[in-house]
Amino acid sequence: MVKGKAKRKIYFAGGSVLSAVNKIIPKNKKKILIFCKGELYDNSETLFGYLMSHKFYEKYEIVCAVGKPQDYQKLVRKNVRFVNLAGSLKEIMTAGFIFYHGEILAIMPTKDQVSIDYWHGTPLKKINHMLEDKLGDYHYDFFTYLTAPSEMFRPIMAEAFDCKLNQVIIAGHPRNDDLFSKKDEFHKLDIVKADYNKVFAWMPTYRISHDKLIMDSSEDFVKNAGIPLFHTAESFTKLNAYMEAQNSLLLIKLHPAQNLEALAIQDMSHIKILTNAYLDQKRVRLYRLLKDTDALITDYSSVYFDYLLLDKPEAFIVEDMKEYGSHRGFVVDNPLDYMPGEIIESQEGFYKFLENCMEGRDAYKDKRREINDKVNHYKGGGNCQRLLKFAGISK
């Protein structure tokens, strides 16, 4: 995101000029652009993987705009290439089809282009235009269509991106296809899942951004890289001892936007810290990893809506819900109504959830299914296939 009113004014003025130029440049209906800005991950990684595994490169040119094209040279082949952000300008103006999951350059697609923003999750917390008082006047609607996972989220996404309702299409997130993959990702991390009784995933949302310009909680809750409840190395040492005694593993996946300067812990025998950079280095698809975990612990992160598709136990740490609500805010009036799992406000509650899972106690199956029906229109895989068909891309 371009920071500062003056810079934004220049940025969007330049975008208006480029949008005018874009109208007169011919489009290649055999070119698919996946715009990533940084790494190839999340929805874009899954969509790219689908295009490759189904050999769409035999009919289409597939271009990925990433931060460091040199990191993806092993994926290059005939009709498949990677460009940097500077090189993406030409691709945006010539591609017939564009997909992205965050921001793209401020260039409006033409009537001869299909540009789809599949964002990077189903929001519980306010995003984009909903945060105009914090983020300032900004534009997010540089697309033909924007996806939402269910009818409930159609007006929410339209408000968040300040676009028309008919631009919002109901489509499952491409990354959710990985929840139904048969591929094992644990071996890439040198983990043998069968060695453990239970494997838990803990995915806290971010409290303070990389650049420290966004802080969504109070000072008391941004210690230890925003990991809630356990704010000291000593408390994690105790937690690790508990996991070891239960012969179980805890995977803590940190949010990609989280500032990690205050991270006070590192890998332990039964606790592993995962970052986007590390998973990318190991070529691990996060959702293929998640599908084989036994339960999810999170807070306000969009991942829990997706995890509902697996019908496994979930828990929600809400120790800073009041502060988070006042700093960031939520897209629904009472977020607790949409949290189908144990509500945790203390370390004791955290341990109790682990114990319940280990002993097979699950009191929230009916509630999970109720919320899943509201937030996920599509319950299985096939999201990449449906999205490409909607865009008009076929083999």
Model-based region annotation:
Residues 380-395:
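C-terminal alpha-helical cap of glycosyltransferases
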Residues 267-269, 300-375:
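Catalytic binding pocket for nucleotide-activated donors in carbohydrate/polymer assembly enzymes
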Residues 2-18, 128, 140-227, 256, ...:
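A nucleotide-sugar donor-handling region in carbohydrate enzymes
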Residues 82-95, 256-302:
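Donor nucleotide-activated moiety binding/catalytic core segment of transferases
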Residues 15-38:
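Nucleotide-activated donor-dependent transferases that construct or modify glycoconjugates
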